Amino acid sequence: MDHSMSKKLHDEALLHIVGGVNSPSRSNKGVGGGIPVTMERASGAYFYDVDGNKYIDYLAAFGPIITGHAHPHITEAITKAAQNGVLYGTPTKHEITFAKMLKEAIPSLEKVRFTNSGTEAVMTTIRVARAYTGRDKIIKFAGCYHGHFDLVLVEAGSGPSTLGIPDSAGVTKSTAEEVITVPFNDLASFKEALAVWSDQVAAVLVEPIVGNFGMVAPEDGFLEAVNELAHANGSLVIYDEVITAFRFMYGGAQNYLGVIPDLTAMGKIIGGGLPIGAYGGRVDIMEKVAPLGPAYQAGTHAGNPASILSGIACLEVLQEEGLYERFEKYGSMLKDGIEKAALKHGIAVTVNQIVGALTVYFTEDPVTNYAEAGATNGELFGRFFKGMLEEGINLAPSKYEAWFITSAHSEADILETIQAVDTVFGKMVQDN
């Protein structure tokens, strides 16, 4: 494929934008470098770049585009919002409609509040949990990404009984020491951390199904035990459902798994492609939020008509009968096709697939936590990513990210993708 215009534009972007991109994940650093492809437009399941190349897209903007690009129902809603004014700074009736839709889909959301992003939603749930419990520390799980605010840019110390250390320049040591990080799916480490820091722990922050070191499900009984132990300790449980809400069913991963948190943060899908976040939970906890309570949260663009109407339209599309069964069918087809191609060419892969989301790890071992994901072969993934791009398949540029199937993907797209995987695996073996 010709990428000359993408290269030209990236060179120009480097002169004006830090690193040439507005989010580090777009830089291709995670696949060994190379020029990121600049897209011109997107429609349905397809991307079209500035050089005229067409791709089947599984990036889905890192998750929000579950209905495919430029879905006509969502486009119509956004157009209507633009015509009537995109920002008021006042309440609108649409906020009520959307809040009711979220509550009906995810019953643990007894009250909700809208924000501008998933990062803001998670950040605020922690503040609210602290206000409710009168405690300061949180426990989170290694490798789970919860946004780019200071408190969650923290990595583990030397063990569950030690405090966190900054995972980014600019995060203070004192901030990091408010966080204890333990391995996902490791109940013994969680118990140890809770025992050591017991009456200081305000909340446990967890992705119920991990989406940020690939798709990783909780082991049987893990989330139930986290709930039981946290509540016995007087701590709240916060689910970060920024990736998972409406991903596996019409509702949250909490509905899908049957384990209910005290607070939930959401984003991505619920905006239909526009910036949005939301959080909610038990009434007694949510009443700590201003103007009813002392925990302050506000936003100029929070609940803006454009994002709200886009979100309403997205959820309306997701109510299509049989949609999530189709996601499951196509996800299973991809997993099976990738595994068969890998076996054919003698390449070791592990595919974690949950409904319409999956991750391909270059390893023969199971992946159940961040350490195991980190041990997979990133060099092979980088070659695979670049090979798939040349075959017209757009993936996320990191071994830690997921493939997302959208409502716009067809069975023909899935079969074409499996053929591309077979071709790329063959070339990878040949190149060795």
Curated annotation (Swiss-Prot):
**Superkingdom as given in the UniProt entry:** Bacteria
Subcellular location per UniProt equals: Cytoplasm
Matching PROSITE patterns: AA_TRANSFER_CLASS_3 (PS00600)
The UniProt catalytic activity note for this protein reads: (S)-4-amino-5-oxopentanoate = 5-aminolevulinate
Point out residues bearing the modification N6-(pyridoxal phosphate)lysine: 268
GO MF term set: glutamate-1-semialdehyde 2,1-aminomutase activity; pyridoxal phosphate binding; transaminase activity
Q: What name does UniProt use for this protein?
A: Glutamate-1-semialdehyde 2,1-aminomutase 1
Please name the Pfam families in this protein's record. Answer: Aminotran_3 (PF00202)
List its EC numbers: 5.4.3.8
Which UniProt keywords are present, listed alphabetically? Cytoplasm, Isomerase, Porphyrin biosynthesis, Pyridoxal phosphate
Name the enzyme's class. Answer: isomerase
Q: Which family does it belong to?
A: Belongs to the class-III pyridoxal-phosphate-dependent aminotransferase family. HemL subfamily.
Q: Which gene encodes it?
A: hemL1
Cofactor(s) demanded = pyridoxal 5'-phosphate
Entry keyword annotation includes Transport: no
Q: Subunit info?
A: Homodimer.
